[in-house]
Amino acid sequence: MNRHWLTSYGERIPAEINPETSGSVLEMLEHAMKRYAEKPAFRCFGQTLTYADTDRLSRDFAAFLQAGLGIKKGDRIAVMLPNLPAFPLAMLGIIRAGATQVNVNPLYTPRELEHQLTDAGAKAIVIFSGVSATLAEIIDRSGLEQVITVNPGDGIGASLPSPPVDTRLKKVTPFADALAQGAELPLATPRLNGDDILFLQYTGGTTGLSKGAALSHRNLVANTEQFKAFTPDALRPGKEVVVTALPLYHIFALMVNFITYFSIGAENWLVPNPRDMAGFVGTLKQAHCTVFTGVNTLFGGLLMQPNIGEVDFSRLRVAIGGGAAVLPTTSEKWKALTGKHILEGYGLSETSPILTLNPMTGRGFSGTVGLPLPSTDIKLVGENDAPVALGEPGEICARGPQVMRGYWQKTEANAAAFTADGYFRTGDVGVFDARGFLKIVDRKKDMIIVSGFNVYPNEVEAVAAACAGVAECACVGKPDEKTGEAIALFVAKIPGATVTEADVIAHCRRDLTAYKVPKEVRFLEALPKSNVGKILRKDLRTLT
């Protein structure tokens, strides 16, 4: 196809990358641990892990998994952690043992966690002790053979307050003990190739149940190389300082902040709780970061802090925004504060994640999600998958070495997810301009994006419909200054029912992560429907 965006690349960006530069993510990251051994790799809670420390401790954890627990190549290990020092140690250990990591949001409810663990067939979980009660609720149905609990100071030798582990959990090994045991155990380095699955990255499903995008080592090596080729001035080996406030269980931070910047010897400041804005600003004051990533709500939250002007951003080279649309006002205020515009990009869990990004050479906020990365083909299609004319909207379909192999054990979903010629259907609608810049104009799906997190209406509706007194319900997104979008739920009551807005919200809080809980519940006599009985969400949107 005609990749007209290549004319906008400039001389320094190649049209293609080699996805085989490293045989695996393990090979790429082990090289970094040796090359930058004495450099700081991670900073958190006032402590530092060097690349050599990370090498040694992740090796010990890998040995514990392999020789201590009998984990074999391809086994799935769930990781349910915030941005603690144990996260990179656990991930590197899982890879070094030859296993596949299943990333889990620590804020998940028992229902959400149970589905993900059983769907993935996870053998063990590495979990923050503070959310162990969530696991305890479903441990007997989880299929797990071992639980490894993490405290905040694990891996860095810091004595920090630690939440108690729920006593209902059995077969529990503290992470610190796992490291100590692993130090005495042998490790057999697995033979990994590009086709081996590195991550199961779960993403919301239109049926209300999330699906695991099977991301291979080649997928992540490719997206790392694509990002490096596209932003060479933001990737100086051994010189970059990154602040990671976005959660590492999210593919954006995992690929960009961790894998890519670790591979070039960057210093990474972990922010375990970005909701603590005072502490977050304090970290920024200390870090003097050269690279910062965020979503619109994160940038906006920082800009509202009264002391953000005290942060020295003079070393900042690049700020990247993703997950949800960056508002023009946010980018303008960020530019006024830091001297740098936010480079907006676009991608999905299924694409490792980056498909497009605005170039660093841009003159300002473009209002687009940028150009397709090297080795990435994007076509926009209309009815019957026919290509649309330039300037016309169409569904964004993508092909490239960063696109997933498919959803984990979902044959039917995989057949529907790709076009006949192998392009992944994103479900988003976009428009290309004459220079090859892509603008997102709509979502073919009814997905709602709250603070950069995808929310699928069917999941929310399935939970809300189980509330006593609810006859039927439907939800849509509505604009929200703080979160970009918020969930508005419309309910038709069972005749005579006395259910209230507070009742429905309380019910949803029991089974949904906080960002999926409706912000507003409105009661209607009946929901608007088509002549075949389909609820008309477009009519509901006019009521928000």
PLM features per residue range, with description:
Residues A266, C289-G294, L303-G364, D377:
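Gly/Ser/Thr-rich phosphate-binding loop
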Residues R96, T100-A180, P495-A497, R522:
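Structural core segment of the AMP-binding/adenylate-forming
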Residues Y108, H115, K285, F292, ...:
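AMP-binding/adenylate-forming catalytic core of the ANL superfamily
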Residues E20-T21, E38-K72, A78-L84, P88-L92, ...:
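Conserved AMP-binding/adenylate-forming core of the ANL superfamily
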Residues V221-V241, I251-T290, Q305:
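Conserved AMP-binding/adenylation subdomain of ANL enzymes
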Residues I13-G23, P161-I197:
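Flexible, low-complexity linker/hinge segments
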Residues G68-K72, E184-D195, L200-T244, A266:
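Conserved adenylate-forming
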Residues D75-R76, P82-V102, P106-P110, T118-A124, ...:
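A short helix-loop-beta submotif of the ANL/AMP-binding
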